[in-house]
Amino acid sequence: MSSPNIWSTGSSVYSTPVFSQKMTLWILLLLSLYPGLTRQKSDDDYEDYASNKTWVLTPKVPEGDVTVILNNLLEGYDNKLRPDIGVKPTLIHTDMYVNSIGPVNAINMEYTIDIFFGQTWYDRRLKFNSTIKVLRLNSNMVGKIWIPDTFFRNSKKADAHWITTPNRMLRIWNDGRVLYTLRLTIDAECQLQLHNFPMDEHSCPLEFSSYGYPREEIVYQWKRSSVEVSDTRSWRLYQFSFVGLRNTTEVVKTTSGDYVVMTVYFDLSRRMGYFTIQTYIPCTLIVVLSWVSFWINKDAVPARTSLGITTVLTMTTLSTIARKSLPKVSYVTAMDLFVSVCFIFVFSALVEYGTLHYFVSNRKPSKDKDKKKKNPLLRMFSFKAPTIDIRPRSATIQMNNATHLQERDEEYGYECLDGKDCASFFCCFEDCRTGAWRHGRIHIRIAKMDSYARIFFPTAFCLFNLVYWVSYLYL
């Protein structure tokens, strides 16, 4: 009877470890499923974010492999010798990315340019066998391999960028191809031809070549799409507009050898807005202002004199200001021509009044009036016979007006100028009025000089502007 109890007790004893094992398995199963549920929820929350990513699996390259490759490449490498020395010239492909151009300094005849300059060549000593296609290296590796001695021939000043680290990049492919790029800011020389200033156009060059290797050692070639530019709206050209660019290759012969010279020409066209506002419009207005004196009474000496002198001095100031933005060139520019002609017009207006005032203030009375003044009897007994006017009133008015004009002409009668040369070409109004006209003489009425000037000066100035602008803008 006791046996069953023992077995039952034994079964209960042996069932306890089995139950605990099952519970442990269930707990482990739940714990293994809980991260999956959490990750599923997290994936649901960031489903949109992860859907836009593309994951690329790349073989992990041990750092030691790159170090071994570099050590093997530099072992026995002489960076003082160019590739293929004594076999063939080293071919260097060049390209350029123009970050910005400007400003252009017309006085010093130079311009500033910021570029990324790249050079590519093959060096068989740098070939390596590895699963790595390219070694992307920083500037510390630049001094350990051979680099072309390229320099910019027309640079006055050149700076490499060093912040925050030297802006240089080096790439080495497993087939021995080397790419070397760096960022430079260059102040390059540009000989400006200012004959058409400020309507001038220029081609500013940027030249580079090898400093010590002639074309038997190094040959430069442009890559396809070798020169690219950034957004020109951010360039600091100010007075200029960027028109385009072109690149050329030429050979320059010197005493030390023939060198391959690569040149990029940047075509610039000057904007006229600044000079139109600062020079052309003020000069034109000053010339027009000088014509006001032609409508002022000739007896108003202070008014006309002060107006003429003021306009002349103003033109002198404008011409001086216009020259400050130019180098001291020995030839006449388009702006110099315009300012000089405007000065001549203003000065001529002042001279016109001086001439008029001289003859008016020094006029002599006519011969009939001199006789009357000398003989009082003629003044006393001189009278006009009474006449009966039977003509219409309008005719009488015309006759009276003619008589009045005749008296004014007599009042402004002048003696002829002295000298045979003057008498050969001119006759005074009094002689011409009485019929003393000679062939080849010019009839000039000094009293009407202002009337002549009102027509001559504006007409001549308009013709000058027409010829000036057509010649410089379209021819």
Curated annotation (Swiss-Prot):
The keyword DNA repair is assigned to this record: no
Topological category with respect to the lipid bilayer: Multi-pass membrane protein
Domain-level remarks: The extracellular domain contributes to synaptic contact formation. GABAARs subunits share a common topological structure: a peptide sequence made up of a long extracellular N-terminal, four transmembrane domains, intracellular or cytoplasmic domain located between the third and the fourth transmembrane domains.
Organism domain of life: Eukaryota
Catalytic activity from the UniProt record: chloride(in) = chloride(out)
InterPro entries linked: GABAA/Glycine_rcpt, GABBAg2_rcpt, GABRG-1/4, Neur_chan_lig-bd, Neur_chan_lig-bd_sf, Neur_channel, Neuro-gated_channel_TM_sf, Neuro_actylchol_rec
Signal peptide positions (record): 1-39
Keywords for the protein's UniProt record, in alphabetical order: Cell membrane, Cell projection, Chloride, Chloride channel, Cytoplasmic vesicle, Disulfide bond, Glycoprotein, Ion channel, Ion transport, Lipoprotein, Membrane, Palmitate, Phosphoprotein, Postsynaptic cell membrane, Signal, Synapse, Transmembrane, Transmembrane helix, Transport
A Pfam family annotated for this UniProt entry: Neur_chan_memb
UniProt cross-references to Gene3D superfamilies, sorted A to Z: Neurotransmitter-gated ion-channel ligand-binding domain (2.70.170.10), Neurotransmitter-gated ion-channel transmembrane domain (1.20.58.390)
Protein function: Gamma subunit of the heteropentameric ligand-gated chloride channel gated by gamma-aminobutyric acid (GABA), a major inhibitory neurotransmitter in the brain. GABA-gated chloride channels, also named GABA(A) receptors (GABAAR), consist of five subunits arranged around a central pore and contain GABA active binding site(s) located at the alpha and beta subunit interface(s). When activated by GABA, GABAARs selectively allow the flow of chloride anions across the cell membrane down their electrochemical gradient.
UniProt activity-regulation remark: Allosterically activated by benzodiazepines. Activated by pentobarbital. Inhibited by the antagonist bicuculline. Inhibited by zinc ions. Potentiated by histamine.
Ranges facing Cytoplasmic side: 297-302, 360-451
Modified residues (Phosphoserine): S382
Disulfide bonding pattern of the chain: C190-C204
Extracellular-facing ranges: 41-275, 323-334, 473-475
The gene coding this protein: GABRG2
Family indicated by similarity: Belongs to the ligand-gated ion channel (TC 1.A.9) family. Gamma-aminobutyric acid receptor (TC 1.A.9.5) subfamily. GABRG2 sub-subfamily.
GO BP terms, alphabetized: cellular response to histamine; chloride transmembrane transport; gamma-aminobutyric acid signaling pathway; inhibitory synapse assembly; synaptic transmission, GABAergic
GO CC, one annotated term: chloride channel complex
Species whose genome carries this gene: Bos taurus (Bovine)
Transmembrane segments annotated in the record for this chain: 276-296, 303-322, 335-359, 452-472
Residues listed as glycosylation sites in the UniProt record: N52, N129, N247
Protein's name according to its UniProt entry: Gamma-aminobutyric acid receptor subunit gamma-2
CDD domains, A to Z: LGIC_ECD_GABAAR_G, LGIC_TM_GABAAR_gamma
